[in-house]
Amino acid sequence: MKFHHIGICCKNIEKKINSIEKIHKIIEKTEIIYDPLQDANLCMLTLEDGTNLELVSGKVVEIFLKKKIDYYHICYEVANIEEELENICSNSGVQISEIKPAILFNNRRVVFLKVDYGIIELLEEK
């Protein structure tokens, strides 16, 4: 598994981008897109140090925002999504979404899991 990005909850993606720009230099930004499979609006930012932030707004993060939680998930890129899913689930992880294509990542497959340290997303390698 290789670190890919941090998922950030937000009510308004444009406002969150403006807030982030006050602290960090953004060197790359995707358009804000709607992913019907996740029922969320999404935008990927790359910061000057290479860190990727996925901004997520919509129903999927409403419960986190109500609790004033901004961090949503950590994403790892994996060679074999089914193999990693099986490994994590056999070590106390709980699958919380189906494996599905993600529009933001050119339809590479993703799956979300709950582990001891929070929510992780597995992203299939290119």
Protein language model features and the residues they cover:
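Glyoxalase I/VOC metalloenzyme domain signal
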Residues: M1-H4, I8-E28, T46-I96, K114-K126
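Conserved catalytic-core motifs of GNAT/GCN5-like acyltransferases
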Residues: E28-D35, I99-I103
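Short active-site-proximal "capping" loops at secondary-structure junctions
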Residues: Y34-L37, V60
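Short secondary-structure boundary/capping segments within folded domains
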Residues: D35, M44-L47
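Short acidic/glycine-enriched loop/turn segments that link adjacent beta-strands
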Residues: P36-N41, L104-R109
